[in-house]
Amino acid sequence: MSIVVTTPTGHVGSRVVRLLLQAGVRPRVLVRDPARLDEAARAQVDVRRGDLTDAGFVRDAVAGARSVFWVDPTPHSAADPIETSLRTAAPLVEAAQVGDVKRVVLLSSIGAEKRHGVGHIDALAAIEERLDATGVDVLHLRCAYFFTNLLLDLEGLSRGVLTTAFDPDHPMPWVDPRDIGDVVAARLLSDAWQGRLVQAVHGPEDLTFNQVARILTEALGRQVRLNLVSDDGVRDALRAAGLPPSAVEGIVGMTAGSRDLVPEQPRALLTTTPTRLGGWAHAHLRPLLEG
């Protein structure tokens, strides 16, 4: 069973690699810096060193794979994030078109079902469509808002402030990336699916940002209050940080385009994962703020 894993050092990919190894599978990992791989796993995986933005590297590295787990590596701060995401995925799509790849599991996002108007998520929607057109077996995992996004504002949380441009009273699904890794590994190891499938990964429950602030207050042992900002406020901050216009709109659009979103896949047994935000925050966020 030949399985390729991209971004194997990330929150999701590292979990996938560990689970595949525990299942007796030696995955082929595409990684820019092998030193960042988990030391215990490094000697047990097939390492292909290169950059996912190098089309030739990707084309060669995925050739002959039974399955590929694809994670778009494009940073939201890229000069043209949507174009970069599509260009980066192009060699995978080409490999699927000519039969060099049999199955793809794509890390997508809720919001991709809208196809347009959701900022950088529009790129994932387009990648979904391009993979669908190849005719290979493809699974689009439309994932919820990552718990780990909270790690991007440790400075604010250290002051007891959670900043957001989302509607504070609108419930949305939140998920632990490790739970996504569990779903990915199970799908990669299974031969029981084929064709085009979409599966949401919604975490254990939908939460409003007001609820998140209360959960963090308890888990972190400190008062956490919401700081609501407007889309224009986010734009101003991103411009001040030097981000180019396409990146600014790609980031703002992900929030603005998701405010009224009702995910295409309803919450159900198949979409619900176990890890709750409070436990995750106590175990992973609190030590960082107390250190």
Task: Label the predicted regions.
Residues 2-42, 53-56, 63, 73-84, ...:
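Oxidoreductase cofactor-interface core, primarily capturing Rossmann-like NAD(P)-dependent enzymes
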Residues 50:
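Cofactor-binding loops of NAD(P)H-dependent oxidoreductases
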Residues 59-62, 213, 252, 281:
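A generic alpha-helix structural signal
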Residues 69-72, 288:
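Short amphipathic alpha-helical segments enriched in hydrophobics
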Residues 231-291:
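A hydrophobic C-terminal alpha-helical subdomain
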